[in-house]
């Protein structure tokens, strides 16, 4: 995992953090809280995929060298490859990087077992989908953000049922659980929002919520969000977190160690009204999956 600049702050006492987590766990299980998953969930052990935008940018650069000044900027590096080598090359490289499947963690399995109306997963892997499939459930489906490059119609998302077959977005209303992947994913169809051009129209429209499916807006309306393994040091990450959680019930929470957050992350949490549960991610996950 790429190391981000820490700041010096006072930590919340551990007992307060764990008491808060115990309450959140009950609300999660009851479907009153939307889990918002980030790739740092994988950073605790051996992984076969990049777990930060910076590491993904470097992985792309290793396969198709980009300009040195943008080497650590995912969105710009992806745009460089798309512009110089064609969109098909970028998609092929992303597919190669994320091809190796990640085994679902205990938290993924726990979330798959709860009857959650909505799960937001912001990375490109297919791990949460795999956990839902392994649960044996068929009452769920997935909505992914898709690129509009090469499209001549207004399209923001595609929907897939539990088997991976593409279906009409209207089918999502009947699903007990929706897995929402706003940036796309390797499975089932290798959809990726990753280059600057992918985000041009999305960022133009996202403030008025156009790219976010109506069924997602409806399911978040009475819920709070719990950010797990998510970072906010990059403006793109902050924009999506703010807009996806917009017009929901509020009372959002994020699990992270405050002393490891960058200054702009702390500022974002304060401005967005997201309360920080200040504890190690590993310890928090252990509590969430216990019992």
Stretches found by the model and what they are:
Residues 2-291:
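SIR2/sirtuin NAD+-dependent deacylase catalytic core
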């Amino acid at each position: 995992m790429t190391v981000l600049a820490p700041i010096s702050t006072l930590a919340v006492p551990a007992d307060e953090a764990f008491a808060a987590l115990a309450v959140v766990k009950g609300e999660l299980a009851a479907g009153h809280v939307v889990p918002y998953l980030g790739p740092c969930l994988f950073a605790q052990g051996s992984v076969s995929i990049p777990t930060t935008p910076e590491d993904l940018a470097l992985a792309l650069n290793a396969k198709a060298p980009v300009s040195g000044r943008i080497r650590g900027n995912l969105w710009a590096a992806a745009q460089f490859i798309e512009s110089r080598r064609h969109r098909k090359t970028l998609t092929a490289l992303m597919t190669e990087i994320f091809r190796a499947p990640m085994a679902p963690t205990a938290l993924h399995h726990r979330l798959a077992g709860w009857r959650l109306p909505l799960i937001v997963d912001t990375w490109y892997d297919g791990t949460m989908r795999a956990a839902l499939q392994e649960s044996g459930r068929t009452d769920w489906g997935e909505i992914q953000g898709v690129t509009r490059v090469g499209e001549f119609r207004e399209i923001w998302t595609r929907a897939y049922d539990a088997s991976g077959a593409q279906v009409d977005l209207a089918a999502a209303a009947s699903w007990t659980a929706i897995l929402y992947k706003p940036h796309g994913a390797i499975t089932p169809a290798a959809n990726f929002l990753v280059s600057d051009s992918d985000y041009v129209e999305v960022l133009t429209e996202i403030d008025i919520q156009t790219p976010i499916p109506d069924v997602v807006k409806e399911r978040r309306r009475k819920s709070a969000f719990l950010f797990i393994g998510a970072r906010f040091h990059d403006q793109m990450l902050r924009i999506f977190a703010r807009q996806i959680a917009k017009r929901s019930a509020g009372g959002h929470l994020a699990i992270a160690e405050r002393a490891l957050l960058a200054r702009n992350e702390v500022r974002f949490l304060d401005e967005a009204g997201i309360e920080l549960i200040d504890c190690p991610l590993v310890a928090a996950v252990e509590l969430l999956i216990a019992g």
